[in-house]
Design a protein with these regions (language model features):
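LRR N-terminal entry segment and analogous cap-like coil->beta motifs
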Residues: 41, 46-90, 97-98
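Canonical leucine-rich repeat
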Residues: 68-71, 90, 111, 132, ...
Length: 398
């Protein structure tokens, strides 16, 4: 009788011990946990449920893990960072306490975060995600998405979001941040976006939109803005006059024709860069005679004025001084152009504004000739762009 009772008691103990061990079928996942002394606290060859429940942070870095079954036992997990693993999906439905999640360089195609309502920080880099539902993640404060083929991103529910970084997601035409009024930093770069509206983001301090195809950008309501980096876009006009806190600005390599920088604090700029905007002839500034303007990075032929009238007068004066001489005019076969400053390019327009011919010397030149023999007879305009001038002249073709 004693032997029978002992056998029964021993069998129950074995079953109970087995029941307290987390089932982890992926050996690489299991080995990573066993080698983590903060998880495998008794240094045996299994992960007990009690050990899983005690773990708050897990980091996996190129462990060749393809299956995270067993992660559901880590019910108190707060931080999960995965990089370079082989997963295409992951089940986080039992990890209700996760506040920080990072998944980097994986082939994951599906990510369900509907159960993770405590999530505050989300980093997704170089994955295969095309869609992502964040409608239940109301506590999100930080989002960093880099190089994911997302076709849409709905942030309407994430109203406490303070920092948004979305980079190299080239399929996104735009991102709606109209509901995210708590945002202090937005970095949406290299996404090929054609439009971006930040008019509701009144708490914004840092805005980076470089490397897109933006045609317009209105920052008139972003009164707390300190940094604006919108280089390498297609912007033709910018108005910074309302941005009195702005002290860092880069809009190089755009198509700027007008720029109003009269924000009342031009002397506070630690960076001001608008080079490679060949059509920007004059910038509106607080004081066109101020010494600090010499530290601004502008094209050689760009001038400074305090009013539109100033700029118009300066541009006319500058262009008249270096205006090229064209002859013969009318022309039959060849048009000769001479200038006091090096010429860079030429463009002939019809009277309706259509471009008929473009030409460019192999190097900056004081003298150039254009073959106009193929031009139909009539009146045209020729724009001559030089190193320090831009001139439009009327020509007649016989």
């Amino acid at each position: 009788m004693k032997y029978t009772l002992f056998t029964l008691f021993f069998s129950i103990c074995i079953c109970n011990a087995q029941a307290q061990i987390v089932s982890i079928p992926d050996l690489n996942f299991k080995n990573a946990l066993l080698n983590d002394s903060s998880v495998n606290t008794n240094f045996d060859n299994e992960i007990q449920v009690s050990e899983a429940q005690a773990a708050l942070d897990l980091l996996f870095y190129y462990e060749d893990i393809s299956d995270f079954t067993g992660l559901e036992a880590f019910v108190n997990l707060q931080t999960l960072a995965i990089e370079g693993e082989l997963i295409t999906s992951i089940d986080l439905s039992a990890n209700l306490e996760v506040t920080n999640l990072s998944i980097v360089v994986t082939p994951i195609t599906n990510l369900d975060l509907s159960s993770n309502s405590q999530l505050e920080s989300l980093t997704l880099v170089a994955n295969e995600l095309t869609t992502l539902d964040l409608s239940t993640n109301l506590q999100l404060e930080y989002i960093y998405f880099l190089n994911n083929p997302l076709t849409d991103l709905n942030l309407g529910a994430n109203i406490v979001l303070e920092e948004l970084i979305v980079s190299s997601n080239v399929i996104l035409p735009t991102i709606d941040v109209s509901e995210n009024t708590s945002l202090k930093k937005i970095e949406v770069v290299n996404n090929s976006m054609t439009s971006f509206d930040v008019s509701n983001n009144i708490n914004l301090e840092i805005l980076r939109t470089y490397g897109n195809n933006l045609l317009t950008l209105d920052v008139s309501t972003n009164l707390m803005l300190k940094e604006l980096n919108t280089m390498f876009n297609q912007l033709s006009s910018l108005d910074l006059s309302a941005n009195t806190a702005l002290d860092w600005f880069n809009a190089r390599n755009n198509q700027l024709q007008t720029l109003d920088a009269r924000n009342g604090n031009n002397d506070l700029f630690i960076n001001f860069n608008v080079i490679n905007n060949p059509d920007l002839q004059c910038i509106l500034v607080d004081d066109p005679t101020a010494n600090y303007l010499t530290s601004w990075n502008v094209d050689q032929n760009t001038l400074f004025g305090n009013s539109n009238q100033d700029c118009q007068s300066l541009v006319v004066d500058q262009n008249e001084i270096y205006a090229p001489h064209l002859y013969p005019n009318p022309a039959l076969e060849t048009l000769f152009i001479e200038a006091k400053k090096p010429m860079l390019e030429f463009c002939i327009y019809t009277t309706t504004g259509a471009i008929f011919m473009q030409d460019k010397p192999s190097q900056p030149s004081f003298f150039y000739q254009i073959d106009v023999s193929t031009l139909p007879s009539g009146v045209y305009y020729i724009k001559v762009v030089g190193s320090t001038f831009r001139s439009i002249k009327r020509i007649v073709k016989y």
